[in-house]
Amino acid sequence: MLPRVGCPALPLPPPPLLPLLLLLLGASGGGGGARAEVLFRCPPCTPERLAACGPPPVAPPAAVAAVAGGARMPCAELVREPGCGCCSVCARLEGEACGVYTPRCGQGLRCYPHPGSELPLQALVMGEGTCEKRRDAEYGASPEQVADNGDDHSEGGLVENHVDSTMNMLGGGGSAGRKPLKSGMKELAVFREKVTEQHRQMGKGGKHHLGLEEPKKLRPPPARTPCQQELDQVLERISTMRLPDERGPLEHLYSLHIPNCDKHGLYNLKQCKMSLNGQRGECWCVNPNTGKLIQGAPTIRGDPECHLFYNEQQEARGVHTQRMQ
């Protein structure tokens, strides 16, 4: 847990595990047991990096507007910078906007997309989430219970572990009493389960379970779109990845491009690399049907405003064409 105001100044602990599932935050919950698992960690916070952080920040002006004289007050709570940052920033309070690249939410809070959002991941990337009280049932449990829940290998345990580890990046500090993962190899398995479930859901033609339908009524699965095929290839590469040690440097993942597909299996206009060392990944614009780079669109660490470089009236994202194939 990070030190609060009023406590003695302590060096920040090493950055938490940077979850591999950041790009798949909005994917449907997956099930199934995990096989091979690898843990990915942020680079350690060296004394040089900590020394470069400077003095603790103060609350923003809006938070102290009611204070007489407008004096800048210390933050109500200090949290680490987004991603793998080592310095302290003011935590976001309940009801404040949050996202992947914004300061984390305070203790007991998490960053959630708005209910009913069709693209929850995109909302979090754009900083359009909201800091709300944690919804998971294990919050407030004893450290022993939390640790036991964290080691659960059931379907719910896998999903909850993913949400917890991901929200440690987006929300408040993690559970101080949580035991370290015994195998040190859970994140990659959860990632594969999530990606598999994501494109499995995109490939479904209906809401009925196969086991409840007559065999004669079953239809062959629709053809995989280029974006879904690329997801398959990424899964295959990760499943055969052999790392020099169980820590798995983040650079191994950063070299992989995980395609951002929409609910129809087409490419989203904006594609981005993962963040690394607290630095926002590059983003670029692609054709939603082919995934190819749109000529003239920039590649920047921010929003390239892809809608300005793609004529939707001409191609209309090819949704009807894809459905007819």
Swiss-Prot record:
Motif span (Cell attachment site)? 301-303
Which protein are we looking at?
Answer: Insulin-like growth factor-binding protein 2
- Keyword Disulfide bond included in the entry's annotation: yes
Its annotated function is as follows: Multifunctional protein that plays a critical role in regulating the availability of IGFs such as IGF1 and IGF2 to their receptors and thereby regulates IGF-mediated cellular processes including proliferation, differentiation, and apoptosis in a cell-type specific manner. Functions coordinately with receptor protein tyrosine phosphatase beta/PTPRB and the IGF1 receptor to regulate IGF1-mediated signaling by stimulating the phosphorylation of PTEN leading to its inactivation and AKT1 activation.
Give the domain of life.
Eukaryota
According to its UniProt entry, one GO biological process term is: positive regulation of activated T cell proliferation
**What PROSITE patterns is this protein classified in?**
IGFBP_N_1, IGFBP_N_2, THYROGLOBULIN_1_1, THYROGLOBULIN_1_2
Where is the protein localized? Secreted
